[in-house]
Amino acid sequence: MIVRSFSDIENTDRHVKAASGTWESKRIVLAKEKVGFSLHETVLYAGTETSMWYANHIEAVLCTEGEAELTNDETGETHWITPGTMYLLDGHERHTMRPKTDFRCVCVFNPPVTGREDHDENGVYPLLTEEA
């Protein structure tokens, strides 16, 4: 059994701050735990815009605080995401988040991330392994 709190993660290598300056993420469960998924709490900052494309991962996101506009960049469809709303990127959709307020969410990734990932120039997380 693993028990881990946010205070255990803050200011460690599990507390990732994006090079873009638009978000930070506490990586709670990672690939090295070998449970088949990773679990993160992520905050996207108010007034920013983050374009993403999880070409190598499936992501489920549950908003716990704040508000943001989610745009499916492939269809142009937009959704207003508020606390209690979930979205699932089951088709590797390119998407953009525009938080109106600081937007806090819980994210699950499959395959699990290692904790070292950040979005590349295409908004993609590279597919890293624990051996990499």
From Swiss-Prot:
It is an enzyme of class 4 (lyase). It comes from the Bacteria. One of its GO terms (biological process) is ectoine biosynthetic process. SUPFAM superfamilies: RmlC-like cupins. It catalyses: (2S)-4-acetamido-2-aminobutanoate = L-ectoine + H2O. Keywords: Lyase. It holds the Pfam family Ectoine_synth. The keyword Lyase applies. Transmembrane segments: none annotated. The keyword Lyase applies. One of its GO terms (molecular function) is ectoine synthase activity. Belongs to the ectoine synthase family. This is L-ectoine synthase. It comes from Streptomyces anulatus (Streptomyces chrysomallus).
